[in-house]
């Protein structure tokens, strides 16, 4: 089920801002074989847990890349950290999601759990507010993992990139176990 976060971040268009398919639909194997792939940015896991492709998200809107490409982490602990130096674009009043803009202009959302907006902030603690500057490793959101597991559809943390350019996608480089701040994915370009 799509919660308010999805409609607040992007209005249901494809990740590239058109009505076409979402970013990340190119043939990765063909591009890799042709040598056309270029790594544009290494992405660190904001939470410890098991990293997986966004297509495995419990929420259909995220899994379908309606808001953009990304990845998920099934958390082992209830703390989300800043994966890099960035500006805090917004923190939802329900404290279940935070938007960041990196110093190099990449915008992304870190969303804790599925249908957690319905918890109205219960089980969450925000350590940042709109407009804050954060350094890599700073605490962003704390959450009671057991409470989330009991009261929400899923506790997975969804990291979705809302400003990818045409031809860019997220490639998971470390599926499976990821410690916080481990390189877990990359923004790659096939242009």
Identify what each model region corresponds to:
Residues 4-191:
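Contiguous, well-folded functional domains in the mature portion of proteins
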């Amino acid at each position: 089920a799509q919660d308010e976060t999805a409609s607040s971040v992007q209005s249901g268009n494809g990740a590239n801002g058109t009505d076409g398919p979402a970013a990340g639909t190119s043939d990765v194997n063909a591009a890799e074989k042709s040598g056309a792939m270029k790594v544009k940015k290494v992405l660190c896991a904001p939470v410890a847990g098991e990293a997986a492709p966004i297509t495995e998200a419990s929420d259909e809107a995220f899994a379908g890349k309606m808001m953009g490409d990304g990845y998920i982490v099934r958390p082992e602990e209830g703390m989300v950290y800043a994966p890099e130096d960035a500006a805090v674009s917004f923190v939802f009043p329900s404290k279940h999601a935070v938007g960041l803009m990196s110093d190099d202009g990449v915008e992304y959302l870190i969303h804790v759990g599925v249908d957690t907006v319905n918890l109205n902030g219960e089980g969450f603690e925000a350590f940042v507010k709109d407009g804050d500057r954060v350094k890599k490793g700073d605490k962003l959101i704390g959450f009671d993992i057991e409470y989330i597991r009991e009261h929400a559809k899923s506790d997975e943390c969804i990291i979705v990139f809302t400003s990818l350019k045409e031809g860019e996608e997220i490639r998971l480089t470390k599926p499976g176990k990821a410690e916080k701040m481990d390189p877990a994915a990359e923004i790659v370009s096939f242009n």
